[in-house]
């Protein structure tokens, strides 16, 4: 019954309107200034994202290897490893929620991106819930060639070259992707996309929506910064 309610809710427009509304209802926090709204909010977000993952840089090679091994295991063993993989994805998102979105900086003290913590925690909990209800079937069947268009993008975001056209293989072990939502999400979504209709649809919908929302936002911010530099 609960699963049916969630399934119906994630098909309604108002559910996603609530997720978007959290942008305004859950402002970022700084220990130096309190809760922040308006233009300052963007500054705090940028500052936190700049510094949040730096303490974990030494662990990135190990984290990359762990992610690769988990993906390889679910591709090889399917449902025999599916429950463990789903739990791993859920826990990964919970770690991302708090590690990527909190940082201590000289300018703002403790900075917290509140809305991201709420969004990413929701995603993590939805996938952890799937460990119990088992809505995802990791039986990988042969797909039409065109459906594999997601794979190159998944590899690219996991690789995450540090600079344009700098495809140094070392980034496959040193990038921030295991703890960065916008980098690891395309990797996970590519797997679930190939399982479409055999996957937990509420979890997939929410993950895809928030990922798309942040992706469009990041592209827009990057474009505006490029325009600003061109005219200064």
Task: Mark where each language-model region is.
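C-terminal transmembrane helix-loop-helix hairpin of multi-pass membrane proteins
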Residues: 173-232
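Juxtamembrane membrane-water interface segments of multi-pass membrane proteins
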Residues: 1-9, 70-80, 131-144, 165-171, ...
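N-terminal topogenic module of multi-pass integral membrane proteins
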Residues: 1-109
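Short, aromatic-rich membrane-interface segments at the entry and exit
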Residues: 60, 81-86, 109-112, 202-208, ...
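Short aromatic-rich membrane-water interface segments that cap or initiate transmembrane helices
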Residues: 44-59, 169-187
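Alpha-helical transmembrane segments of multi-pass integral membrane proteins
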Residues: 14-28, 87-99, 115-133, 142-166, ...
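Non-cytosolic membrane-interface motifs at loop->transmembrane helix junctions
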Residues: 106-118, 140-142, 170-179, 228-232
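Juxtamembrane "helix-exit" motif on the non-cytosolic side of transmembrane helices
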Residues: 32, 98-108, 159-171, 217-229
